[in-house]
């Protein structure tokens, strides 16, 4: 009992669990402890076992009273009384090893005992709990699969809608194709013409601006030279003032010369100022040219905006394509998730099978280990001569337990022999019954042959 893989319930717990899991209605209400103590009732156990088989395997009630189709029996009506017990044992013999009970026998149906039946019912209830948890997990997996399928359907619908939108954006209606082509051609021509005009005017303005810059630089150089000449003349004048001669004639002549040079310088200065004013007017004309340039720039900006609009439309189409690709990737992910869920279920089934195999193997190992330990204990007990009083009492208890086990084995053998004798007696009775039937059939066939012979003779005589 130490190697059981399920808890051992008492009678009260068994009654509660059976009412909750197996028996419902009046059967569950009528169930009580007296049905299991002191000796369990076979009728109640039949009903519990049948309900468990109906719940797990889906076996209907009429299946217990039907002869299997793969068995040929000459007189099936003779087995009607034993057939429900035989079919119940057949189903329970395959069901109890699943509940981790490997010693279920037909005696447990015909003559049940309290300890064994409580262990069997504990195993059945534990398996039903395990089955319910597995069904809940399976339902969760099915709900997840259903939700993923619904999501995949939604994404496929969104994918199709996006494809339709993309086709609408890419395709131009037949009525507007010519206008669209003309519009695109006009835009390209205008863009080309504006670019050429803008380039020509910008080149001309740049050339004029460069010329004006060069002229202004030349004039400024000339002014600087004139200023330098004035400074040099002032220096010469100062020098000459220091060297003035007292003769008035020379002074007059020198003054006349100086006046002439001053007039020349003034006339040159006026010419330079006039040219400076002209260049200043030309520089003032530059803003109007700049306004024209700004207009051309605005036109080019409008063209750039149109280009940006076209690029935005292209970007939207690309975004739709990206969305379609992302939707397709999500569809692939959902498919991979579905495949992974299927793989998880298969892996869990394999793990369950391996766990069952390991548990069976552990039980066998524990049995072998117990046998080895018992043999070792016997050897140690034989080797030790002087033992304490406690050890002797323990040995006596062990001997008592062994004798009880031996008695149980003897009773088990006796019951097996009794069942075998009953089976042999039933078999011999059936054989005798078959022989009697065969004899009666032979006698009747002989009598029929005699009667037919007599009738034939009478017919011949009549003829």
UniProtKB/Swiss-Prot annotation:
Complex and partners: Component of the NDC80 complex, which consists of NDC80/HEC1, CDCA1, SPBC24 and SPBC25. The NDC80 complex is formed by two subcomplexes composed of NDC80/HEC1-CDCA1 and SPBC24-SPBC25. Each subcomplex is formed by parallel interactions through the coiled-coil domains of individual subunits. Formation of a tetrameric complex is mediated by interactions between the C-terminal regions of both subunits of the NDC80/HEC1-CDCA1 subcomplex and the N-terminal regions of both subunits of the SPBC24-SPBC25 complex.
GO biological process: attachment of spindle microtubules to kinetochore; cell division; chromosome segregation; mitotic spindle assembly checkpoint signaling
Keywords: Acetylation, Cell cycle, Cell division, Centromere, Chromosome, Coiled coil, Kinetochore, Mitosis, Nucleus, Phosphoprotein
InterPro entries listed in its UniProt record: Kinetochore_Nuf2_N, Nuf2_N_sf
Species annotation: Mus musculus
Localization terms from the record: Nucleus; Chromosome, Centromere, Kinetochore
Primary gene name: Nuf2
S-S pairs: none
Region of interest called Interaction with the C-terminus of NDC80 and the SPBC24-SPBC25 subcomplex, as start-end residue ranges on this chain: 386-463
Protein name: Kinetochore protein Nuf2
N-acetylmethionine found at: 1
């Amino acid at each position: 009992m130490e190697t059981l893989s399920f808890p051992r319930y008492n009678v009260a717990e068994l009654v509660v669990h059976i009412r909750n899991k197996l028996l419902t209605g009046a059967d569950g209400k009528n169930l009580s402890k007296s049905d299991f103590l002191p000796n369990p009732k076979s009728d109640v156990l039949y009903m519990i076992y049948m309900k468990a088989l109906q719940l797990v395997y889906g076996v209907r009630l009429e299946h217990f009273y039907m002869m299997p189709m793969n068995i040929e029996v000459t007189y099936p009506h003779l087995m009607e009384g034993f057939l429900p017990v035989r079919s119940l044992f057949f189903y329970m013999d395959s069901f109890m090893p699943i509940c981790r009970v490997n010693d279920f026998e037909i005696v447990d149906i015909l003559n049940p005992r309290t300890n064994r039946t409580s262990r069997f019912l504990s195993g059945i209830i534990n398996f039903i709990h395990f089955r319910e948890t597995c069904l809940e997990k399976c339902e969760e997996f099915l709900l997840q699969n259903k939700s993923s399928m619904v999501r995949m359907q939604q994404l496929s619908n969104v994918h199709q809608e996006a494809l339709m939108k993309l086709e609408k954006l890419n395709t131009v209606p037949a009525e507007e194709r010519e206008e669209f082509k003309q519009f695109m051609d006009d835009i390209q021509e205008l863009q080309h013409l504006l670019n050429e005009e803008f380039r020509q005017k910008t080149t001309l303005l740049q050339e004029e601006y460069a010329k004006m810059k060069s002229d202004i630089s030349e004039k400024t150089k000339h002014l600087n030279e004139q200023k330098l000449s004035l400074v040099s003349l002032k220096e010469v004048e100062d020098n000459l003032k220091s060297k003035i001669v007292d003769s008035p004639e020379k002074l007059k002549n020198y003054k006349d010369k100086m006046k002439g040079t001053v007039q020349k310088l003034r006339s040159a200065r006026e010419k330079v100022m006039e040219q400076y004013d002209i260049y200043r007017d030309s520089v003032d004309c530059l803003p109007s040219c700049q306004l024209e340039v700004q207009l051309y720039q605005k036109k080019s900006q409008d063209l750039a905006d149109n280009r940006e609009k076209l690029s935005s439309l292209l970007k939207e189409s690309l975004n739709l394509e990206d969305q379609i690709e992302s939707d397709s990737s999500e569809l692939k992910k959902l498919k991979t998730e579905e495949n992974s869920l299927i793989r998880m279920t298969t892996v869990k089934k394999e793990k369950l099978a391996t766990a069952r195999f390991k548990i069976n193997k552990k039980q066998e190992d524990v049995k072998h280990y117990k046998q080895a330990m018992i043999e070792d204990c016997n050897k140690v007990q034989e080797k030790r001569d002087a033992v304490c009083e406690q050890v002797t009492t323990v040995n006596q208890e062990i001997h008592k337990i062994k004798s009880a086990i031996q008695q149980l084995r003897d009773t088990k053998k006796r019951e097996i022999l009794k069942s075998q004798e009953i089976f042999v007696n039933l078999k011999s009775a059936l054989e005798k019954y078959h022989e009697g039937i065969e004899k009666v059939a032979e006698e009747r066939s002989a009598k029929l042959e005699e009667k037919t012979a007599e009738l034939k003779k009478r017919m011949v005589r009549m003829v």
